[in-house]
C-alpha cells in the first residue's frame, strides 16, 4: 500500500518542485525546491489518496481519539531532499492553522524508513497541555524557542504512523542521507471545528 501511495504522490510532488525551480531562489514560503517540498490537497486530485485517507486504520484512530464525528482537515506530502542540512524547526501544527476547538489530530505517515540520519520527527511530550504556544517567524517557518533536551526521537519504518495532537511541539532533523525522506501527513478535526483567521 505504501508503494501505491508514493506512486500517486510523486507526480504531484515533481510538479511542485518544478514550479519552485521557476521562482526566485527556488522557494516559496517554507517550500524549497532542492531541500523540502510541501504538496498539499492531494485528496482533491487523487481518488486513491482520498480512499487512503478514509482507510479503516485512520477511522479507528479518529474514533478512539476524537469521537465519531470527524472530518479530514488537511493533507500534505512532505519530501525532504538528500543533503538538506537544516532541520524543520520546533512548531505546533496549530501554529500554522489555528482552529477551534484547538486540538486536531496529526497522522504522520512514513513513506520511507526514517531515523535521525534523514529527518525523522522529534516530539516534545507534555507541552500540548499548555495550548497554542508563541511561534517566532523565521526563514524556515514558524518556530517555538524550546530546549530540546527533553525531546523524544521517533524513528519510523515505511508504513508506520506517528500520531500526535496539533498542539504537540515537533520538529524534523536534517536529511544527511542520499535518498529522499518521504512522508504523508493526514490531519483530522472534529466535525464542526472552525479555522480561526488571526
Task: Label each residue range with its predicted role.
Residues 86, 99-103, 178-180:
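A generic structural micro-feature
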Residues 93-95, 104, 171-175:
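Glycine-rich phosphate/pyrophosphate-binding beta-alpha loops
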Residues 93-96, 149-151:
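Short, P/G- and charge-enriched loop/turn segments at secondary-structure junctions
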Residues 114-173, 193:
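Double-stranded beta-helix
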Amino acid at each position: 500500500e505504501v508503494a501505491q501511495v508514493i506512486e500517486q504522490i510523486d507526480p504531484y510532488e515533481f510538479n511542485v518542485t518544478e514550479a519552485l525551480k521557476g521562482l526566485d531562489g527556488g522557494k516559496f514560503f517554507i517550500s524549497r525546491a532542492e531541500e523540502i517540498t510541501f504538496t498539499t490537497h492531494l485528496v482533491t486530485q487523487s481518488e486513491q489518496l482520498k480512499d487512503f485517507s478514509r482507510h479503516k486504520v485512520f477511522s479507528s484512530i479518529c474514533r478512539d481519539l476524537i469521537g465519531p464525528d470527524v472530518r479530514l482537515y488537511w493533507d500534505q506530502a512532505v519530501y525532504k531532499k538528500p543533503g538538506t542540512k537544516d532541520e524543520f524547526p520546533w512548531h505546533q501544527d496549530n501554529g500554522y492553522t489555528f482552529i477551534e476547538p484547538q486540538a486536531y489530530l496529526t497522522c504522520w505517515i512514513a513513506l520511507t524508513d526514517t531515523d535521525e540520519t534523514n529527518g525523522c520527527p522529534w516530539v516534545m511530550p507534555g507541552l500540548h497541555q499548555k495550548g497554542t504556544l508563541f511561534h517566532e517567524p523565521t526563514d524556515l517557518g514558524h518556530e517555538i524557542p524550546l530546549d530540546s533536551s527533553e525531546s523524544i526521537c521517533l524513528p519510523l519504518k515505511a508504513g508506520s504512523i506517528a500520531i500526535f495532537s496539533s498542539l504537540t511541539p515537533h520538529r524534523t532533523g536534517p536529511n544527511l542521507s542520499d535518498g529522499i525522506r518521504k512522508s504523508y501527513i493526514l490531519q483530522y478535526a472534529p466535525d464542526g471545528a472552525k479555522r480561526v483567521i488571526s
